[in-house]
């Protein structure tokens, strides 16, 4: 984290990232605990939605978040937008709760039992391989490579799920198997207009290509080392805890904005019988999405909730990116407050 030349800097209690800055073991503990919290939310909220789900009302008009996603994956015996076999959703929810406990225990184990700094482990040990310094591009890209490979495997799992089990097709109102369309021309052309994609086969083709791309990229980052000018290309002299955090926040903000507009306008990936009608973009104090369907007062579709929440979370993540990017570049925000204090205390004298 940025210290502005002060070797004995202290951080406030709310600066949570500072606790893992130079302690790679604590960093892993925080990751595991965070994943456990997300798992717990998903499981608990799915059970909450199941308890209030009414099959006589369109799913998109019931302010649901988790159930439409599960239905879109073909879980719950969905037919014409109605869940007919909620047992499958219950199983998924309970599994998430169980795994959340496992991940939470892993976070506590890494935090309380194992070394806070993986660098304290013997040379050549598996734990030592994942120790890192924030300004070491070799070790950071080694870890990045593993992340990319697991993301690629996740894409493969999704593609195979659609091919073998099937996903929900709103055009037919049933769950059907979907084979991927690995048309590179289609994938290239959808780089700019992916919001308009209207074929599940094309969606799966994009994920299949992305899986290949991610795994190749992961292997590349694991295998390559610093060499000549490539050292600077990997970020030598640019990397720090603050800068890596800013890059991550920028990526999350981008994903949130894409999800917001995709959910608001696309009915292939976000079917109307699961999420409600498409939205309209309005501008007042700030941009926001509004429902186009006739709904009771103060009622909103699942599409409206998802799109607006993603949009505003993306906005605040973007502000966090700018904040940490400027700090990583050396800008001291305390100077802003000092400048205002100097303006208030300045005396104007007649010439």
UniProtKB/Swiss-Prot annotation:
<dbReference type="InterPro" id="IPR036001">
    <property type="entry name" value="PS_II_antenna-like_sf"/>
</dbReference>
<dbReference type="Pfam" id="PF00421">
    <property type="entry name" value="PSII"/>
</dbReference>
<dbReference type="InterPro" id="IPR000932">
    <property type="entry name" value="PS_antenna-like"/>
</dbReference>
<comment type="function">
    <text>The antenna complex functions as a light receptor, it captures and delivers excitation energy to photosystems II and I. The Prochlorales pcb genes are not related to higher plant LHCs.</text>
</comment>
<keyword id="KW-0603">Photosystem I</keyword>
<comment type="similarity">
    <text>Belongs to the PsbB/PsbC family. IsiA/Pcb subfamily.</text>
</comment>
<keyword id="KW-1133">Transmembrane helix</keyword>
<keyword id="KW-0472">Membrane</keyword>
<keyword id="KW-0148">Chlorophyll</keyword>
<feature type="transmembrane region" description="Helical">
    <location>
        <begin position="244"/>
        <end position="264"/>
    </location>
</feature>
<feature type="transmembrane region" description="Helical">
    <location>
        <begin position="64"/>
        <end position="84"/>
    </location>
</feature>
<keyword id="KW-0604">Photosystem II</keyword>
<protein>
    <recommendedName>
        <fullName>Divinyl chlorophyll a/b light-harvesting protein PcbC</fullName>
    </recommendedName>
</protein>
<dbReference type="GO" id="GO:0009522">
    <property type="term" value="C:photosystem I"/>
</dbReference>
<dbReference type="GO" id="GO:0016168">
    <property type="term" value="F:chlorophyll binding"/>
</dbReference>
<keyword id="KW-0793">Thylakoid</keyword>
<keyword id="KW-0602">Photosynthesis</keyword>
<feature type="transmembrane region" description="Helical">
    <location>
        <begin position="27"/>
        <end position="47"/>
    </location>
</feature>
<feature type="transmembrane region" description="Helical">
    <location>
        <begin position="203"/>
        <end position="223"/>
    </location>
</feature>
<keyword id="KW-0157">Chromophore</keyword>
<dbReference type="GO" id="GO:0009523">
    <property type="term" value="C:photosystem II"/>
</dbReference>
<feature type="transmembrane region" description="Helical">
    <location>
        <begin position="306"/>
        <end position="326"/>
    </location>
</feature>
<comment type="subunit">
    <text>The antenna complex consists of divinyl chlorophylls (a and b) and divinyl chlorophyll a/b binding proteins and binds more divinyl chlorophyll b than does the antenna complex from high-light-adapted Prochlorococcus.</text>
</comment>
<dbReference type="GO" id="GO:0031676">
    <property type="term" value="C:plasma membrane-derived thylakoid membrane"/>
</dbReference>
<dbReference type="GO" id="GO:0009767">
    <property type="term" value="P:photosynthetic electron transport chain"/>
</dbReference>
<feature type="transmembrane region" description="Helical">
    <location>
        <begin position="89"/>
        <end position="109"/>
    </location>
</feature>
<keyword id="KW-0812">Transmembrane</keyword>
